[in-house]
Amino acid sequence: MRAVVQRVTRGEVRVDGEVVGAIGKGFVVLVGIAEDDTEEDIAYMADKLVNLRVFEDEEGKMNLSLLDVGGEMLLVSQFTLMGDVRKGRRPSFTSAKKPEEALPYFNKLVEEVRKKGVKVETGKFQAMMKVLIENDGPVTILIDSKKLF
């Protein structure tokens, strides 16, 4: 499972001009689900997202988590994060889980983050979306449940 985590002052997702998810201060997280992901990857990602310390404390040091600051999370499924461009010029998405298999994993990730006490909004699975991301910093972190960057 792969995630691009962006610290934001606000985030919003629109589908066909209608807002389907919106948050204030927190994270916009783009999530790619890999063919070989398991329940362990979901648990790992949920824990990392909720406890990632990238919000500033009173001394200006990145030391606080989403839970510490009462932040929200906008989770957006994005299979293109699994794209492989090492060969040729067109990305290959063979490492992405098929949509009908990925949806339950995405929903389980949403559920696990909510269980940890974070307000979660989402985009619309498999829809063309317009994603508004008002970066704060900017702070952007890459997380992969299987790889180090």
Curated annotation (Swiss-Prot):
PANTHER family: D-AMINOACYL-TRNA DEACYLASE 1 (PTHR10472:SF5), D-TYROSYL-TRNA TYR DEACYLASE (PTHR10472)
Notes on the domains: A Gly-cisPro motif from one monomer fits into the active site of the other monomer to allow specific chiral rejection of L-amino acids.
Function as written in the Swiss-Prot or TrEMBL entry: An aminoacyl-tRNA editing enzyme that deacylates mischarged D-aminoacyl-tRNAs. Also deacylates mischarged glycyl-tRNA(Ala), protecting cells against glycine mischarging by AlaRS. Acts via tRNA-based rather than protein-based catalysis; rejects L-amino acids rather than detecting D-amino acids in the active site. By recycling D-aminoacyl-tRNA to D-amino acids and free tRNA molecules, this enzyme counteracts the toxicity associated with the formation of D-aminoacyl-tRNA entities in vivo and helps enforce protein L-homochirality.
Keywords: Cytoplasm, Hydrolase, RNA-binding, tRNA-binding
Underlying gene: dtd
Principal subcellular localization: cytoplasm
Swiss-Prot/TrEMBL catalytic activity: glycyl-tRNA(Ala) + H2O = tRNA(Ala) + glycine + H(+); a D-aminoacyl-tRNA + H2O = a tRNA + a D-alpha-amino acid + H(+)
Subunit details: Homodimer.
Source taxon at top rank: Bacteria
GO terms of biological process kind: D-amino acid catabolic process
One MF term in the entry's GO annotations: D-tyrosyl-tRNA(Tyr) deacylase activity
Pfam families listed in its UniProt record: Tyr_Deacylase (PF02580)
Descriptive protein name: D-aminoacyl-tRNA deacylase
EC number(s) on file: 3.1.1.96
GO cellular component: cytoplasm
Magnesium listed as a keyword: no
Family matches, as InterPro entries: Daa-tRNA_deacyls_DTD (IPR003732), DTD-like_sf (IPR023509)
Family per record: Belongs to the DTD family.
Classification via CDD domains: Dtyr_deacylase
Location of the motif Gly-cisPro motif, important for rejection of L-amino acids: 137-138
Localisation: Cytoplasm
